[in-house]
Every structure is written in structure tokens, then in C-alpha cells.
Design a protein with these regions (language model features):
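Acidic glycine-/aspartate-rich tracts in secreted/extracellular proteins
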Residues: 75-78, 145-148, 298-300, 428-430
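Cytochrome P450 core scaffold surrounding the K-helix E-X-X-R motif
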Residues: 80-83, 297-310
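C-terminal, surface-exposed recognition/capping segments
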Residues: 203-206, 234-260, 272-275, 279, ...
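Short, solvent-exposed loop/turn elements at domain surfaces
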Residues: 78-86, 148-153
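Charged, compositionally biased non-catalytic regions
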Residues: 18-67
Length: 430
């Protein structure tokens, strides 16, 4: 059965348009809106229930290697508007989301230049939806961290030992799959999925994290956001944020132990899966808080307080283990922060440029503790071959979360071999 037939068969309820409405069922993922032949080119097929917003498989697709991936439709955001529902509480960080297809400026594969993200009335296209200088109608992100699918392929599989970028003969390491047992194996094995794939970019992770923030702000109960907190003190995705497969803020969370040992958890093994997804629903991206330090491409920190982020002209698939920190792929700016473990606080609200627009959700506006962002860690550690890790940071517990951004995180460098290094792949449609 081809993708056209599957798309007609799966699900019976009408799906929300695109990214959906924050706080509501299905928000944060969606049905691929392009030509079904794009899915075929990517090796993807819709799962049963893919078009049904009530299904655990809503917006979920399966790759030929067994990977489960979530479709994240392109969206625009608006920050700090006085008419935003949460403005009285969240002020400058009150976040609104609209599907990008609602704006006449947006078109899949349309050429993009710096400044084109300004869609008017404060609405801004997220940087994650530009790849290789063109607008993209979505990205697909692995639902789970990558593990070995049994054929030495990195695949997103439920209840599995996520792959450690570790120089060890254990079955759950990239070394046993033919890699070097180093952080940069994450790049190699992610892009091996096909021409449209790469290691998840810092922009894609930012988009996913911002969706979680907007969903928490838009929710009024746990009906469609299982991790919702009406007191707004722990209103963010939970996960394996303690070093024993439990969550720092929610004692009801428990994971199965990774084969490495009880310090780590198997991906997709939570007893409360909705609570550990980015959108508080079973259809969402899992294990985005804690678990391990999850590698992303597209960021460098080569000198003090200077961060480089992926250029507009660069495609995510362009990154390899050999060019991973090349200056030709990154544009630098001064964050004003410098080395040390701090906190992530605030979303940058620019309409153009790397420092103020592209960095939104990647680099904070300040480094003070902020419960809106989970009191998550932000740390810089300048050296020539450093990369950005997400989710866990250097100390687990309160500072681990979906807004954790760490240039250190253990040994930190791409060439480092470390048991807390994991990853997931993402892809763009042709």
C-alpha cells in the first residue's frame, strides 16, 4: 500500500491544521502537508492513526529502519504581545504560536534571506524552518533517542538502550556499530539514515522546546498536557532528570534501567509517557528532559563568550564529523556570558540576524534562574572542538530539562568519549 492510500485510511477524526493550537489536543506535532512522494523519498510512512489527533500515533511516521519520527509543521511565534493569554504572568516571554501556512509569505522551498522571517504584527518564522537557504514546511524529529536496531543502524525505537558515544565493546555503544566511540559518531550515524537526514540541529531542538513552553502556557488542565502544573512552578516536560531513572520534580515518574546501569534509563520506557513528551501527549517527542546529554549540530563556542550558530545558507545534511566546527558553517556573535554553569532565562525577540533572531530558544537573554524555563542549565565552555548538548547538563536534577543548553556536559568535546553522550536524528522533506 502506498502513502496516498495510507493517508486516506489512517485516523477518522479531523486533524488540526498544521501545528495546532497550544493547550489543545495534538498541538506540537502534525500531519505532513506536502506531497506523499516526499515521504517515500525520505523512507517514511504514516503510522496507524497518524491523522487522528486522539491517537498516540498522531503526526507519527515510521522509517524503513524502524525509527519512529514525529512531524513538526512549520510555525511562527510571537513574544511578549500584551494581548497574549499569558502576558499578565509571563510578560516578555508570553509565547504565541501560529501555523506558518496561515501567512502568505510562507511557501515550502521558497528562497529565504535574512529579514524574511518578519511576517508582520510581531509574528516571526522560527529559524528551524529554513534549511540550505530555503523555507521548509516541517521537520521530522526522532520520537526516541537513537539505539542500535540490530543491523548497526541508529534508529528511534521505544524501550531501548540509547546509543552511547563511547569507546567500549558494549552492545549499546557507537563503537560496536563501527564508529570511533566519540561524540562525532552522532553526526555520522544520524546522516547515514539518508540524504534528507542529519543529527538534530540546535534550531530544531529550540523549536521543539518553544512548543513545550507555549503548550504549558496555553493549557488549563492535564487533559491534553499531562505535565501541566496549575501553579506554574513545574509547568514543563518531566523526564529522567535524576541519575536513577526518576524525575526531580515528579515522584510518579520511573523509567526502566539502561543496560549500562541504573544511573541511566532506556529511552521510551517511562511509566508515564505523556509526562515526558514535549507536548504532554503520547503523540509527542519523548525524553526531552534529562536522560543524557543529547548532541545537536549547529553551534560552536571557540572563544570566551563567543558562540557560532549555523548559517542560513547551510543545510543540516552538510554537516559531517570532519567539518563539524568549521567557521564556514557558522556565524559568530558575543553572548556576553562566558564560561561557567549558569541558567537559561528568556527568549530572544529579534526579526533578523544570528544574535537576536536565529538564536531564539538556543541562547538565553539572561542567565538568572527562572522557573518558567525549569531553572535549566546554560553553560559555555570555550575550546576549539566543542558542541552543544541538550537536556541534561552537568549536574542532572533541577538544572536538567528541555531548555538545558550545555557546551560542557561531561568532557564536552566532539572527539570525547563519554557515557552520557546520546543523540537523535531529524530530517527535512525534499
Amino acid at each position: 500500500m502506498d502513502n496516498n492510500a495510507l493517508l486516506l485510511l489512517v485516523g477518522s477524526r479531523k486533524a488540526p491544521k498544521g501545528i495546532g493550537k497550544a493547550g489543545q489536543q495534538g498541538f506540537g506535532v502534525g500531519v505532513y502537508g506536502g506531497d506523499p512522494s516526499d515521504l517515500t523519498a525520505m523512507g517514511l510512512a504514516p503510522m496507524q492513526g497518524c491523522k487522528n489527533p486522539a491517537s498516540k500515533n498522531y503526526g507519527n511516521y515510521q522509517h524503513t529502519n524502524g525509527s519512529i519520527m514525529c512531524c513538526v509543521p512549520a510555525f511562527c511565534y510571537r513574544l511578549g504581545n500584551s494581548n497574549a493569554p499569558s502576558y499578565s504572568r509571563d510578560g516578555a516571554n508570553a509565547l504565541e504560536i501560529r501555523d506558518a501556512s496561515e501567512f502568505p509569505q510562507f511557501k515550502h522551498n521558497k528562497s529565504f534571506s535574512d529579514g524574511d522571517a518578519d511576517f508582520g504584527d510581531g509574528w516571526i518564522l522560527h529559524r528551524a524552518f529554513i534549511d540550505g537557504g530555503k523555507m521548509k514546511n516541517c521537520f521530522f524529529m526522532d520520537k526516541y533517542l537513537c539505539s542500535n536496531n540490530g543491523s548497526n543502524q541508529a534508529a528511534s525505537i521505544k524501550n531501548a538502550d540509547w546509543l552511547m558515544c563511547l569507546d567500549s565493546s558494549s552492545s549499546y555503544t557507537t563503537k560496536t556499530m563501527g564508529g570511533d566511540g566519540c561524540g562525532y559518531d552522532a553526526i555520522t550515524f544520524s546522516r547515514a539514515r539518508g540524504d534528507h537526514y542529519s543529527l538534530t540541529t540546535v534550531y530544531q531542538w529550540s523549536a521543539m522546546a518553544m512548543l513545550s513552553l507555549a503548550h504549558g502556557q496555553g493549557a488549563s488542565s492535564t487533559s491534553y498536557c499531562a505535565w501541566y502544573d496549575s501553579a506554574h512552578t513545574t509547568n514543563f516536560p518531566k523526564g529522567a532528570t535524576n541519575s536513577d531513572g526518576t524525575d526531580y520534580n515528579d515522584s510518579s515518574i520511573k523509567y526502566n534501567a539502561h543496560s549500562y546501569g541504573s544511573d541511566f534509563a532506556k529511552t521510551g520506557s517511562s511509566n508515564n509517557a505523556e509526562k515526558v513528551s514535549h507536548n504532554g501527549q503520547l503523540c509527542g517527542i519523548m525524553d526531552v528532559a534529562g536522560m543524557c546529554n543529547q548532541w545537536c549540530i549547529g553551534a560552536t563556542n571557540k572563544s570566551s563568550a563567543t558562540v557560532g550558530l549555523m548559517k542560513l545558507s547551510v543545510s543540516a545534511h552538510d554537516f559531517t564529523k570532519d567539518n563539524r566546527v568549521d567557521d564556514s558553517l557558522h556565524e559568530t556573535f558575543n553572548t556576553g556570558f562566558g564560561d561557567g554553569n549558569k541558567n537559561f532565562s528568556g527568549l530572544r525577540n529579534g526579526k533578523s540576524g544570528t544574535a537576536n533572531w536565529a538564536s531564539c530558544g538556543v541562547i538565553p537573554t539572561s542567565t538568572s534562574a527562572n522557573s518558567l524555563f525549569g531553572n535549566d542549565e546554560y553553560s559555555e565552555y570555550f575550546t576549539s572542538d566543542i558542541g552543544l548538548k541538550m537536556g541534561s547538563g552537568s549536574g542532572w536534577e533541577e538544572n536538567a530539562g528541555v531548555f538545558c543548553r550545555s557546551f560542557s556536559g561531561g568532557v564536552g568535546t566532539w572527539y570525547g568519549s563519554y557515557y552520557s553522550f546520546g543523540f537523535r536524528a531529524s530530517g527535512y522533506a525534499p
